Amino acid sequence: MSNPLLVCQGIRKVYQEGAMETEVLKGVDFQINGSELVAIVGSSGSGKSTLLHILGALDEPTAGTVHFQENELTKLSANKQAKIRNQHIGFVYQFHHLLADFSALENVAMPLLIGGVNKKEAAKRATELLEKVGLAHRIEHRPSELSGGERQRVAIARALVNKPALVLADEPTGNLDHKTALDIYNLMRELNQESGTAFLVVTHDNELAAKLDKQLSMQDGRFITETVRSSLAQEMEA
């Protein structure tokens, strides 16, 4: 088994409003190994999205530690956290968050340009990735001209363009019909197998979650069960 890519220990998150405290995460411990496909399932309000924000250094835990590639995220400066987000962690959301006035190509190239890659190289890499996700014929189209499934494919391409070690996906198929959701799942697994990128997927879809390597069930701010998919099932699908 590969070395842990991400390790969380004792993650707590408490929101305070006046004298009232709300504990959203209650001591979460888990790890993701390189190249794993992991699902987090649970009802709304169980703490899934809050945890994802902490793992992506978009929010800070009240207590506990997050180590990503041996860096303790909460001890890094804001600039170093931003660099890790740009270069080593990709993000996909239920709502694609594509820039409406930019083409698919421009949206995918944006993280590269922000990271200092020149326009020619950024366009080349973005084009290659859009071809990989089956959108070579749509690279000049804006988000409003794409279907829901196509927009999510663009969002996944954007998340992967910097060749991150980890992609955090928050309900990436939540707005899609079942067939399109299955297509997106198959795309994530294909890209995982090709690039070795690990995926952590928050989802309400138990059927899709069961297809990933590991499923973590969250309830009331804690993980209550962990299910590891059998190696035989993984081999049969590969």
Curated annotation (Swiss-Prot):
* Biological-process GO terms, alphabetical: lipoprotein localization to membrane
Q: Any one cellular component term from GO for this entry?
A: plasma membrane
Q: Which InterPro entries match?
A: AAA+_ATPase, ABC_transporter-like_ATP-bd, ABC_transporter-like_CS, LolD_lipo_ATP-bd, MacB-like_ATP-bd, P-loop_NTPase
Where does it reside? Cell inner membrane
Molecular function GO terms recorded:
ATP binding; ATP hydrolysis activity
Domain of life of the organism encoding this protein: Bacteria
| Annotated EC | 7.6.2.-
The record's section on Pfam families has:
ABC_tran (PF00005)
* Binding partners and assembly: The complex is composed of two ATP-binding proteins (LolD) and two transmembrane proteins (LolC and LolE).
PANTHER family of this UniProt entry?
ABC TRANSPORTER ATP-BINDING PROTEIN MG467-RELATED, LIPOPROTEIN-RELEASING SYSTEM ATP-BINDING PROTEIN LOLD
Q: Which family does it belong to?
A: Belongs to the ABC transporter superfamily. Lipoprotein translocase (TC 3.A.1.125) family.
Q: What is the name of this protein? A: Lipoprotein-releasing system ATP-binding protein LolD
Origin species: Aliivibrio fischeri (strain ATCC 700601 / ES114) (Vibrio fischeri)
Organism classification: Bacteria, Pseudomonadati, Pseudomonadota, Gammaproteobacteria, Vibrionales
**Corresponding gene?**
lolD
